[in-house]
A protein has these predicted regions:
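N-terminal cap/lid segment of alpha/beta-hydrolase-fold proteins
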Residues: 1-23
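Active-site glycine-rich loops that stabilize anionic/oxyanionic intermediates
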Residues: 35-39, 113, 248-249
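Conserved alpha/beta-hydrolase
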Residues: 41-43, 48-74
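Alpha/beta-hydrolase active-site loop
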Residues: 79-99
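Alpha/beta-hydrolase-fold enzymes
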Residues: 121-209
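Short beta-strand/loop motif that positions the catalytic acidic residue
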Residues: 244-246
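Conserved alpha/beta-hydrolase "acid-adjacent" motif
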Residues: 251-261
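Catalytic active-site module of serine/aspartate enzymes centered on a nucleophile-bearing elbow/loop
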Residues: 269-307
Length: 307
């Protein structure tokens, strides 16, 4: 069964569009899938099917400025002006909708890339409502974020918040192909599989096809800021299990260093966190044909252990 849902965004402007995928057999839990920057939730259909086959209801939406939500609202790359917690609060609204439809089930988050940042922000505010969180392809202190944030802040102060200046995106993300060799497409850092690169680049629902506003890029840098260090980790309930996974060739996680920084912040504040790095793989470990089944099986096993 598939429910299409919609709700008012925290930004007080957009309608957010989402889906709840329900397996035929009675469900043992719910997992909410949170997609990353410049993509949309239906890039995860393989994972969604695997989660359903394992007995989980899956809830997912397209963030403001992304995917169907951007198409229906005419707001490609524009996340609104309510700040860096907008997407996190929208994800919590989706949680409430899913829980109302299917009450009493253990509830998990899976967040990839920017989605992992949203999941970490969510865990700091609403973690007591969850049974576990998987963060995939997350970051530590993101390289160049503070410097880019300062430039964006100056542009916004000059009244350029609604403009889209690609140079800021280049400042923040342009270095990530530094070890990729061929960079003819520009997204090679996500995966070494040319099919995945081309599919991502050609997908009309990927927000990388449209420039992101300066205000939204600033909010993106602040999303990174609020989930840094032990100050963030102390806000996450100690009882919340966390599974931290990534590829060791992923620039978002500084090739493992940032991934382990997150684990160390959590462990130093008494948290239960399990970490797994996949050797030889870039950002989208769930899209490599040779390991995606194992990646998904690992997430399912983590959830099964924490029902």
């Amino acid at each position: 069964m598939l429910h299409e849902v919609s709700f008012q965004s925290f930004n007080e402007r957009d309608t957010v569009y989402g889906w709840i995928y329900v397996p035929a057999a009675p469900a043992k839990g719910i997992v909410q899938l949170i997609h990353g920057f410049g993509e949309h939730s239906r890039r995860y259909l393989h994972m969604i099917v695997k989660f359903m086959d394992a007995g989980y209801i899956v809830a997912a939406d397209d963030h403001v400025g992304h995917g169907k939500t951007a198409v229906e609202n005419g707001t490609w790359g524009d996340w609104g002006d309510k700040g860096c917690h907008t997407m996190m609060e929208d994800e919590h609204t989706l949680t409430l909708i899913a829980k109302e439809k299917y009450p009493g089930l253990p509830y998990f988050l899976f967040g990839h890339s920017m989605g992992s940042m949203i999941a970490r922000d969510y865990a700091a505010k609403y973690g007591s409502e969850l049974s576990g969180v998987t963060i995939c392809g997350t970051c530590g202190v993101f390289r160049g974020a503070s410097e880019t944030a300062q430039k964006l802040s100056e542009a916004i102060a000059q009244g350029r918040g609604k403009e889209s200046d690609p140079s800021f995106t280049a400042d923040l993300l342009g270095w990530m192909c530094e070890y990729c060799g061929d960079t003819s497409i520009g997204n090679e850092w996500i995966c070494s599989d040319p099919y995945v690169q081309r599919d991502h680049a050609d997908d009309p629902f990927d927000a990388f096809t449209k420039p992101t506003t300066n205000q939204s890029m600033y909010d993106f840098t602040q999303m990174m800021e609020v989930i840094n260090g032990t100050e963030w980790a102390q806000k996450v309930p100690v009882s919340l299990p966390i599974y931290n996974i990534a590829g060791d060739l992923d620039p978002v996680g500084e090739y493992g260093e940032g991934v382990y920084a997150v684990t160390n912040w959590l462990r130093s504040t008494g948290h239960n966190v399990k970490t797994k790095l996949y050797s030889g793989y870039r950002h989208e470990i769930h899209n490599y044909n040779d390991i995606k089944d194992a990646v998904e099986a690992g997430v399912i096993a983590f959830m099964d252990e924490n029902l």
